[in-house]
Amino acid sequence: MNVSKTEQDMRKAIEATAGNFATIRTGRASTSLLDRINVEYYGQPTPLKTLATITTPDASTVLIQPYDPSSLRLIEKTILESDLGLPPSNDGKTIRLNIPPLTAERRKDLVKVLRNLAEEGRVAVRNIRRHAIDEVRKEEKDAKVSEDEARRLQDEVQKLTDKSIQQIEKLFEAKEKEITTV
């Protein structure tokens, strides 16, 4: 049983959760809003950031400048179909996304989405824990480790799990505060 691998897997789960949190808009323009957007470009789902320069000229605008002008319509269509809820405005060369101030209702909805993402992160950490503990039990059954050593490893995995879930909770609280702050 390798505890460091379990710790590494849990760290990856936390990073993935933090990445998901970054894609939730908070009323301020951010290029990370578009990180999850994949455009169907020449039959391949392609990340938007590889097809265009994405900038934030001011606090409420995201500017998308495609490298290939012919992809402008595809990008616009993809953004419209996405769950961003932001209508793109196309001027023929660039696409602008105006980030409106969040309404109280939209803030509540975003907190719900955030809560679900946090729960997904916690579930991922728990799955890693379950896998690690199963591995310890198997090693104990196969007499590779003693009962005391197995108990110690399980306790260590549980401590890692608690620490990881606590980190996800801190990330959630920080992002929730960011969303709910007017």
From Swiss-Prot:
<keyword id="KW-0648">Protein biosynthesis</keyword>
<protein>
    <recommendedName>
        <fullName>Ribosome-recycling factor</fullName>
    </recommendedName>
</protein>
<dbReference type="GO" id="GO:0043023">
    <property type="term" value="F:ribosomal large subunit binding"/>
</dbReference>
<keyword id="KW-0963">Cytoplasm</keyword>
<dbReference type="GO" id="GO:0005737">
    <property type="term" value="C:cytoplasm"/>
</dbReference>
<comment type="function">
    <text>Responsible for the release of ribosomes from messenger RNA at the termination of protein biosynthesis. May increase the efficiency of translation by recycling ribosomes from one round of translation to another.</text>
</comment>
<dbReference type="GO" id="GO:0006415">
    <property type="term" value="P:translational termination"/>
</dbReference>
<dbReference type="InterPro" id="IPR036191">
    <property type="entry name" value="RRF_sf"/>
</dbReference>
<dbReference type="GO" id="GO:0006412">
    <property type="term" value="P:translation"/>
</dbReference>
<comment type="similarity">
    <text>Belongs to the RRF family.</text>
</comment>
<dbReference type="Pfam" id="PF01765">
    <property type="entry name" value="RRF"/>
</dbReference>
<dbReference type="InterPro" id="IPR023584">
    <property type="entry name" value="Ribosome_recyc_fac_dom"/>
</dbReference>
<dbReference type="InterPro" id="IPR002661">
    <property type="entry name" value="Ribosome_recyc_fac"/>
</dbReference>
